[in-house]
């Protein structure tokens, strides 16, 4: 799973509890690797966000993370609140928490750098003819091969949104929908507004309200 929020991981985790047969979930990150560091070390700590080729994954804190913590802390919501209220000033050490070892054994993780993203995109399109976006590439590149097991990778975006990644990738132009090509050729228009609710509301009601 190319992960930018905890939500995707939690959905699959809940699905296994409802009967979906999964042997594990692999969490793929880009260079903003807060979750990879967590599953590698047991320490949840915030770092500075770094710009990458997979921009939707450029996070320093995983939203919805409390959902996993509820499981780790055996439904102790007061403890979850205490730890999160002190974060990110204080990192969270999961290693001594009751259910961490069991949960951590179900998840693996990886970190994919920008160059690895580019290489993965080129490899997949050359071998299969299928063009994946940079977020999906983190999952394809990061997930280790598993013998005699089926691997399901979640694709998350259309590659045409990321022309700066694919300019030198064969087959990119053919994968851009005509509607999107037409948008790229149009003149960009925008209006600058003051950072005030009243000004924004007036602009919307004056120009777009029916």
Question: In which residue ranges do the predicted regions lie?
Answer:
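Single conserved hydrophobic/aromatic residue that forms the stacking wall/gate
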Residues: 1-7, 11
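Short acidic, glycine/serine/threonine-rich loops at helix termini
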Residues: 11-17, 36-41, 164-167
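Mg2+-dependent phosphoryl-transfer active-site scaffold
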Residues: 13, 20-29, 33
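Alpha-helix C-terminal capping segments
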Residues: 13-21, 141-147
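Beta-sheet entry/capping signal
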Residues: 23-26, 129, 150-153
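Active-site/ligand-binding loops adjacent to catalytic centers
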Residues: 27, 31-134, 138, 169-210
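Extended hydrophobic-aromatic, low-complexity segments
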Residues: 134, 149-151, 162-165
